[in-house]
Amino acid sequence: MTFQQNEPSAVPAQSSLSFTQGFLLGQLSVVLLIGAFIKFFIFGEAPPPPSRGLSHRASTHRRSNSIYTINPNEGTSRSLREKPSTSNVLRPVPSSATNTRSILRKTYYSAIPTNPSGKHGRHRIHHSSHQPESLDWFNVLIAQTIAQYRQTAYLLKDDPTSSILSSLTAALNNPEKKPSFIDKIAVTDISLGEEFPIFSNCRIIAVDDPNSDGGRLQALLDVDLSDDNLSIAVETSLLLNYPKPCSAILPVALSISIVRFSGTLCISLVPASTPPLHTPSPSPSPPTADGAVNAGIHPTNGSREPTQEAPNAQEESPPKTSPKSNVAFSFLPDYRLDLSVRSLIGSRSRLQDVPKVAQLVEARVHSWFEERVVEPRVQVVGLPDLWPRMGRTGVRTGEDSETGSNAASRSAMSADMGNSLRADDIGREPDGLRFRGLGARPPFDSVSRTSSFNVETGGFRSHSMTREGSGGGMSDDFHMPGTLPGGAAAN
């Protein structure tokens, strides 16, 4: 009986001990899990971002072997054993380097032809599957450039040869293009506007081009300009020359304003080896630098005499100008150009805002625009020379001054360079934008470097803009201050 009474009392002690061990083990496992979570998920280091270096590109993107990596041992042995000639110093460019698909693959731009179309003439456009890109940064740069053009045009408003007023007056009164029944045209008001064009929805497409291997790439940008006061006002008179000259005179005043312009801008590169684009415009093309060389117009120096006849000049001295890459831009035919034309006809009893006059002016402006920059016609502008040169090196205002040794060496170099440039390039026009003042500017030396910010993209020129005499076309006489290079020649 004693054994039976003591046996049930030992069971609760063993069960309580196992419960305590299990409870402690569970608490310990929970603490370990919480500690591991805090260590590895909260205080752990984040994985490094994917690198776009050369090693990452080589591991993630499979690239086709070029001619330089086909057999490196063979190339090394050949370069050590054989002495390369002068013509073999520059390694050949692979044929696939300029291919459209190769360029898109190496730049990681997906331009898969998902929707081939036969629009826009003979070219077949391959639309890209890449998402359209924003152009906010590009809008800021374009706005700064246009603002600088407007400021430059205003600073030169009193210059008799370089002002926009004199340029427009000379262009409108060109005797070879102005009809005889129109009297002298006087510009009474010019407004260059205050707003800026907004570019958006940029996309790259592939266009079939028989002149290039694999087609060519073309950038499409949507542009919109609205709510601006870009306008010009002129006054003239209509002359009745029958039965005798100036039998009757009818005064006419016109004002043309751009209300809104929107369209799609197409930009593409024209390689130097590509033949010039065919322009079906009936008007003869204006003379260019290359055309002047081909026509026998050569710079006069001490060792060469000016040529007299164009055929002999072509046979004796072929053109030595290197080929130059160009940028071609145009607008698609679905553009929108809204104009506001106001007219005032007569001297005593005047007719105001005649609808027929507005229709004629709008039709003429649209025709002028379509003959120059609407597909299939394009404007071709040469790319500027971006090689760093001392002749166009400047120092921003407020930067640290130069040390004595650097200033002395640069001043001596600029003096020697200035003498040679003044002897050779004094009559050469710059190829791009140059910030000019109203008065004459001192030579570009170390003093002017530290006092102001001068940017030059071409040769030296005088303080006033000059127009060279030409055949008398509107494109030859019309030169707007601050325009893009080649813009006047394209007209």
Swiss-Prot record:
Domain of life assignment: Eukaryota
Domain notes: The SMP-LTD domain is a barrel-like domain that can bind various types of glycerophospholipids in its interior and mediate their transfer between two adjacent bilayers.
Transmembrane segments: 23-43
Role noted for this protein: Component of the ERMES/MDM complex, which serves as a molecular tether to connect the endoplasmic reticulum (ER) and mitochondria. Components of this complex are involved in the control of mitochondrial shape and protein biogenesis, and function in nonvesicular lipid trafficking between the ER and mitochondria. The mdm12-mmm1 subcomplex functions in the major beta-barrel assembly pathway that is responsible for biogenesis of all outer membrane beta-barrel proteins, and acts in a late step after the SAM complex.
InterPro entries in the record: Mmm1 (IPR027537), MMM1_dom (IPR019411), SMP_LBD (IPR031468)
Name of the protein this chain belongs to: Maintenance of mitochondrial morphology protein 1
Organism: Aspergillus flavus (strain ATCC 200026 / FGSC A1120 / IAM 13836 / NRRL 3357 / JCM 12722 / SRRC 167)
Ranges of compositional bias, category Basic residues: 54-64
Family as reported in the entry's similarity comment: Belongs to the MMM1 family.
Oligomer and partners: Homodimer. Component of the ER-mitochondria encounter structure (ERMES) or MDM complex, composed of mmm1, mdm10, mdm12 and mdm34. A mmm1 homodimer associates with one molecule of mdm12 on each side in a pairwise head-to-tail manner, and the SMP-LTD domains of mmm1 and mdm12 generate a continuous hydrophobic tunnel for phospholipid trafficking.
Keyword Endoplasmic reticulum: yes
Chain positions covered by the region annotation Disordered: 50-95, 275-325, 392-491
Comp. bias (Polar residues): 65-78, 85-95, 300-315, 403-412
Stretches with biased composition (Pro residues): 275-287
GO CC term, one of those recorded: endoplasmic reticulum membrane
Listed Pfam families: MMM1
